[in-house]
């Protein structure tokens, strides 16, 4: 059984980050790691980063035409490492085209690096902030150059205090080396990089809510994602990228897109950081090539399922928003955007939550529902009414005495098409979870339901 909260296994993964060991890279070309210091865990002073080749050739990269940078990112097939996996190059190009208008020339774009990391089961971004700060800074500089931005905000989860302090020290070091500020490395280009602590709300991980939080407003999603490109922060054209996405940019630009696409498979390139927690022997963060088999990820790089693979009952492959896969699906699927989409699941943030008891399925869903009921903005019917209404039904399923009428009501509430009547993707998160148990665990639902 999972314990109170999200479960003690997850709490161990969240709170024991100092002792988390990031495993060796799986299946990469020549064993290359995008983020080697996640294993080495050296203190990243800027002189050490420079000695390791970070910021190398940056003065030349700053001279690139922005479209050249965007083309390299497009060729790499890099997709967002946050929740939605949107092609990064296309996002950059959309903003670049938008700012080529008369209005765009008068107003400089803004870049936002999203390190809010409020998803249940995700702790990869915290390790990036702690151990690869200069890769984040360098990636932010490259992203800003690609869209000709002069300001970048690093939005960090509020309770990542130590990581925020460390990042600020590294930013100060970068300013001292003329890597930030006016006239970067003797060029005419300038970039100001500012840290902004998150509002402490789960909803600020959503793009438009994040922008409202940065503006000092109450974070409520209300802007379609495509509109933030033309009118985002303070009405300026805005590029929002996840911190892991940004951290991939230096290697892509320096080593070339062919290097990046040598890992993974078409439309699912490069490596990915996976936060693995729950019923595994070694909860940790793993850097693996895209398309690694899920079973291989768990068995060979997370110490295996507690009690052995035969004890496995299900896995949330991308956090709660991805829904839960049954054992048979877990044995077949590979960890990438397209393979999981084919199962009506998603990669999400790469938060892999492993369960080895059927009771845990319904206990985890109940815990997630309680979390959403207090942490979403309650604007849309799904989050405002739907989530709270299903809590009693999920309690019944967990305890084995759900009523058939309750189940029919629950499934009807979440039977709307995806993204129907919702402002943001969070409204679909609970919907995916409900659909996944209905689709992948029908026998368990029948077993736990009273007919009368």
UniProtKB/Swiss-Prot annotation:
One of its GO terms (cellular component) is mitochondrion. Keywords: 4Fe-4S, Flavoprotein, FMN, Iron, Iron-sulfur, Metal-binding, Mitochondrion, Oxidoreductase, Transit peptide. [4Fe-4S] cluster binds at residues 377, 380, 383, 424. FMN binds at residues 198-245. One of its GO terms (biological process) is cytochrome complex assembly. Its EC number is 1.6.-.-. One of its GO terms (molecular function) is 4 iron, 4 sulfur cluster binding. The keyword Iron applies. The keyword Iron-sulfur applies. It comes from the Eukaryota. It is found in: Mitochondrion. Residues 1-25 form a transit peptide. It is an enzyme of class 1 (oxidoreductase). Signal peptide: none annotated. Binds 1 FMN. NAD(+) binds at residues 80-89. Pfam families: Complex1_51K (PF01512), NADH_4Fe-4S (PF10589), SLBB_2 (PF22461). Its cofactor is FMN; [4Fe-4S] cluster. Belongs to the complex I 51 kDa subunit family. This is NADH-ubiquinone oxidoreductase 51 kDa subunit homolog SPBC18E5.10, mitochondrial.
